[in-house]
A protein has these predicted regions:
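Non-catalytic, structured segments within soluble enzyme domains
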Residues: 1-81, 85, 233-234, 238, ...
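Conserved catalytic neighborhood of penicillin-recognizing serine enzymes
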Residues: 22-23, 169-228, 244, 273, ...
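Structural recognition of the beta-strand scaffold that forms the well-ordered cores
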Residues: 83-84, 116-120, 127-131, 174-175, ...
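A penicillin-recognizing enzyme superfamily signal
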Residues: 84-105, 117-119, 130, 137-147, ...
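Active-site SXXK
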Residues: 94, 125, 149-176, 205, ...
């Protein structure tokens, strides 16, 4: 971690308010609206609890909407101070990078390609910085927290291999089939147009991100009646149908950057999922802290499973078969490249989406 991470978390959203008036969209950006959205959720919960609103009353949409409006009004005019986890230096550096190099995404005849990134503290889930998009003025969709897309192959270590290892059905040296295979309907399972090869170990399957081994691994989980949904629900995933054959390849899954970063945070945190958050505390005008974030870690994978998966994904980064991240980082910052990196890529059909998630023991960055 760069020095100052623990002390330089000083973005206070309430400083953006002017005379208690509501903000206008022109003067704010992704940061303001992302923080405000989470702060409104926190304030809503506080007001409902303070006023002892019953669960029965909250079934009334008008009551819920009324309290959401009150939550926003309280934040804007109630004299509250909202402290976040956002590190200004980190956040600004991420915006500068997106601004200076975002144009590279438009090469090759592409135009308007968007970007979303999240940087998360592994031990706590604190979000230290993010990129919501290339330009809030041109596109108000928040590609870090709101836009949901297929995760492609980046889901393989989470929904297939990780669960199989955790269930004792697979080990780090397991041999898997990559022989040509079809989906039930007869469509070949391809990898960059390749129909498959032969048997291979798990490390090779991950390094190249072959699809067929992940397919068969998920089939094995289903044959053994493994509660895959139980695992995924612990991490906040909402998947409508767990019987989709292409699920371990990203089919039938829609996820945000923040959600997927959180899954890799779990792998780098001994299997403990710490839900990502930006609101550290809210203090009222008298100085009383009405909200303080508290850790509610959930053990998703065993520590042993997380360690095995972490080691496998280290070689994925170092070998560089699917990403040049490590070699390019060496050229830019040798000290940063020497960190204990692990990670995984993911792409969707016709490269509509391209993902990369990388972690050190301290932080996870992805998008």
């Amino acid at each position: 971690k760069p020095s100052g991470y623990e002390s330089y978390k000083d973005y206070d959203i309430t400083k953006d308010f002017k005379d208690g008036e509501k903000s206008d969209a022109v003067s704010h950006d992704y940061l303001y609206y992302s923080v405000m959205s989470e702060a409104q959720d926190v304030m809503y919960d506080y007001l409902v609890k303070r006023d002892k609103v019953s669960s029965q009353d909250l079934k009334n949409d008008k009551t819920k909407e009324s309290y959401r409006e009150r939550a926003l009004q309280e934040l804007q005019a109630g004299g509250y101070s909202v402290k976040t986890t956002i590190d200004n230096a980190v956040y600004n550096a991420m915006q500068d990078a997106a601004s200076q190099y975002g144009g590279l995404l438009d090469q090759g005849g592409n135009s308007g390609v968007e970007v979303g990134n999240v940087l998360m503290d592994n031990a706590t889930g604190a979000i230290l910085g993010f990129v919501g998009g290339r330009s809030y003025e041109n596109n108000q969709n928040n590609h870090a927290f709101d836009t949901a897309r297929s995760p492609g192959s980046s889901i393989k270590p989470i929904i297939a291999y990780g669960i199989a290892i955790d269930q004792g059905l697979m080990g780090s040296s397991s041999i898997l089939s990559n022989y040509p295979t079809n989906f039930t309907g007869g469509t070949p399972i391809l990898h960059d147009g390749d129909k498959g090869t032969a048997m291979m170990n798990l490390q090779e399957a991950l390094n190249t991100s072959w699809n067929i081994p992940a397919f068969w691994t998920y089939q094995m989980l289903q044959r053994h009646d493994v509660d895959v949904e139980g695992y995924m629900t612990k991490m906040g995933y909402k998947i409508a149908n767990y019987n989709i054959e292409s699920l371990p390849l990203g089919g039938g899954i829609e996820t945000t950057v923040a959600q997927q970063v959180n899954a890799y945070q779990m792998l780098s945190n001994g299997g403990v999922y710490e839900k990502g958050y930006m609101i550290d505390s809210i203090t009222d005008r008298t100085g009383e802290v009405i909200y303080q974030h508290k850790s509610e870690g959930v053990q998703v994978f065993s520590r042993a499973t997380a360690s095995i998966m972490d080691n496998l994904l280290k070689e994925v980064v170092v070998k560089g078969a699917t990403t040049q991240f490590h070699s390019e980082l060496k050229n830019v910052n040798g000290a940063a490249a020497s960190a204990d990196w692990m990670g995984k890529t993911g792409t969707t059909d016709n490269f509509a989406d391209a993902w990369l998630f990388v972690s050190t023991p301290g932080i996870t960055l992805g998008g």
